[in-house]
A protein has these predicted regions:
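Bacterial N-terminal signal peptides
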Residues: 11-22
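Well-ordered beta-sheet/strand-loop patches within structured domains
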Residues: 30-32, 118, 136, 143-515
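Short intrinsically disordered, low-complexity coil segments enriched in acidic
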Residues: 2, 22, 33-36
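Cationic-aromatic interfacial patches
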Residues: 27-129, 133
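Intrinsic disorder/low-complexity segments in short proteins, especially the signal peptide
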Residues: 21-24, 208
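Bacterial N-terminal signal peptides that target proteins for export
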Residues: 2-13
């Protein structure tokens, strides 16, 4: 990259100063943020304000020496700085702005350090140095901030919500904890409890009660019940309208802690490759939700929300990564993964020789041919030289369709032979793959560029267990991500449980990173 000459001279001047031999050689014309009188240009004040407000994007102002820079600029506005002080301030502001812009755009840590294995997307390269050089020439930092800000879905809405929670940090409603619940652990309609006035204050501060609503009643009124019900809906709680232990624990979480949770989602939106194609599929593990997006006027618009089932938290968590979907298989065979075969299925086959027939399974040798059940076949299954697969049909574990995005972890999207499981609120119950509730809708979205696959043909292929494999004309990015705060279809903010403990990992990584 071609270096701007004034910036190069400023860097040289500061390096010499650091060696205590540049004071007499430093010239105001070499500095970027100060004028000829060694006082701040307006653009320097703009930069300091942005750094001080870094927490509004989920970043940390102390990381950028924001207060120190703001104070130094304020002092320089009153009295010109000595040359060596001016050089030091100029360099500090340059480095802080560059660090802020890069961390705003790319994030603060490498996601692979917390088991989130994303391949960078094909977005245009972000060159903070070049954009800063241009900004200093024009006196306008807005193009730099705009280019640095992620364009990911939900980012701006979550940023707005973050600022709302930051404003609530000092709210007196969280100045003291709620009193202990009675032994029954649930406050019921019109029951009295001394904590209800404080609860009403918190619900009003969060927007669940009108500011004009009475906040001094010690009874659980219908109005307060409705507010509790709405709060429960947006915080992954059973929506009963009663004030129970889970709701108490949730609303005792302070606005500062909630702001940190939103900030973690903003950090993840900087990593996740959500800006790379005309159409994409995003699976959000904590939400048990799949969203399909289509790009309109350079903005990703959600076109399809679908409930999903994901991997069990302790034993089979669904990995977090991205790959391109390349084909769809109707009426797929289910090739039983070796771990499931070894740990779960082989003991059943050994104890019940009819298990293979009843489940519509077959044993397959290394040559791909079917093998009858025998002691030799059991030995082959045990040593891995043979495998088991389930034939297509009504009881097939994959249902009527499988969506394939090749990866080395054998993860894919598929339907299921047990659709009733989608009615459960907590749906971390698979062996790692992602089960989708509405496979026909997803197939229609995926096969958009394959016009011969009409809605009727898709339905027939799934319902009649016919069809085979279809290669997509245009691969579709699939991103399996982990966002514990989201903006729902109703435009409200939802807080989700940290089902895999990834938020805790991210928080530790942020605390340990170099300052």
């Amino acid at each position: 990259m071609k270096t701007n000459r004034p910036f190069a001279r400023a860097s040289i001047a500061f390096s010499l100063f650091a060696l205590s031999c540049a004071t007499q050689h430093a010239h105001a014309a070499d500095w970027r943020w100060l004028n000829a009188n060694n006082q701040p240009r307006p653009i320097a004040i703009q930069a300091a304000k942005q750094l001080v407000a870094a927490d509004s994007d989920g970043l940390s102002p102390p990381d950028y020496e924001a207060s120190k820079i703001e104070s130094a600029l304020a002092a320089a506005s009153k009295a010109p700085l000595a040359p060596e002080e001016a050089a030091k301030l100029d360099e500090q502001l340059t480095q802080s702005v560059l660090r802020y812009a890069n961390e705003l755009h790319h994030g603060r840590i490498d996601p692979k350090t917390i088991r989130e294995n994303y391949t960078p997307d094909a977005r245009p390269p972000f060159d903070a140095n070049a954009l800063l050089t241009q900004a200093l020439a024009t006196g306008d930092l807005q193009p730099l901030w705009q280019a640095a800000t992620p364009k990911a879905p939900m980012y701006e809405e979550l940023r707005t919500e973050l600022q709302r929670y930051l404003r609530l940090r000092a709210h007196p409603a969280w100045g003291s904890p709620l009193p202990a619940l009675p032994k029954a652990a649930t406050i019921r309609p019109m029951q009295e409890w001394p904590g209800l006035p404080l609860l009403a204050q918190r619900l009003a501060a969060l927007g669940y009660l009108p500011a004009s609503a009475p906040q001094d009643s010690r009874k659980l009124t219908p109005e307060l019940q409705q507010a509790i019900s709405s709060y429960q809906k947006h915080h992954s709680l059973k929506q009963s309208g009663l004030f129970d232990r889970a709701t108490s624990e949730s609303i005792n979480i302070t606005p500062t802690e909630r702001a940190a949770q939103i900030a973690q989602t903003l950090e993840r939106l900087r990593w996740a490759p959500l800006q790379q194609a005309q159409r994409m599929i995003v699976v959000n593990i904590p939400e048990y939700r799949l969203r399909a997006y289509t790009l309109y006027n350079y903005k990703a618009i959600e076109t399809l929300p679908i409930n999903v089932i994901v991997g069990r938290a302790r034993s089979n968590p669904t990995p977090l990564f991205n790959k391109d979907m390349q084909r769809v298989e109707f009426s797929p065979f289910w090739n039983v993964p070796p771990s499931i075969l070894r740990k779960e299925m082989l003991p059943r086959i050994q104890n019940d020789p009819d298990y293979i027939r009843r489940g519509n399974y077959e044993i397959v040798g290394s040559n791909g041919k079917k093998v009858e059940l025998s002691p030799e076949a059991l030995a082959g299954l045990a040593n891995g030289s043979m495998r088991v697969r389930q034939r297509p049909g009504r009881g097939n574990a994959l249902g009527g369709v499988k969506f394939i995005f090749p990866n080395n972890q054998n993860i894919y999207l598929h339907h299921t032979s047990s659709p009733g499981l989608f009615k459960r609120e907590t749906r971390a119950m698979s062996h790692g793959c992602v089960r989708v509730d509405e496979p026909k809708l997803l197939a229609k979205f995926v096969l958009h560029d394959n016009p011969e696959w009409t809605e009727q043909r898709i339905s027939t292929a799934i319902d009649k267990h016919a069809g085979g494999a279809v290669q997509l004309k245009q691969p579709i990015p699939v991103i399996i991500t982990y966002l514990t705060t989201v903006i729902g279809e109703d435009k409200n903010l939802y807080f989700l449980p940290d089902v895999y403990g990834q938020d805790k990992l991210l928080q530790r990584a942020l605390e340990k990173r170099p300052k």
